Amino acid sequence: IVEYNPKTGWAYAVNGQTGKLAAIPLKTMESKDTVDLLDANDIDIKSLVEAADTSFQYGDMTSVTISEDGTRLAVSLQAENYAADGRIALFTCNADGTLSLEKIYETGVQPDMITFTPDGSKLLTADEGEPREGYSKGSTDPQGTVTIVDLASDTVTKADFTAYDSEAN
């Protein structure tokens, strides 16, 4: 998963296994240049988040988004325990491609598809809540939700789908 920041000229590629975000200076690259993502400017999201939120154990980085004005970047992070709540890490984008951690927000289980609203006032994640062992008897089926972060008021709301439970087959 890759996002480009036209304001700074940097692209960011998710490496969920290592917990690092590869920062690629596209603005300064020439057409003859190639990028080895293994040698990119890595930002260790896993270490940054685990140091800032000691209650969270990193499992996977699933998605990245950049605000339309190019000033902020956010990533969605699943917990090591697939049935535990995930996190959003929100960063300020610096001109040199580096990121400064602003805040960490708790999400529902297995957040993915992170996005800013067009006006940049909110962050949204689809919290998948999928069972890892299938739907067999005794398996854990975490609740799916949508997390809404209001950045102005610094509040988190998790919208669930329990109102539709009566419509299940």
Which residues make up each language-model segment?
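Mobile, glycine-rich extracellular loop/lid and propeptide segments
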Residues: I1-N169
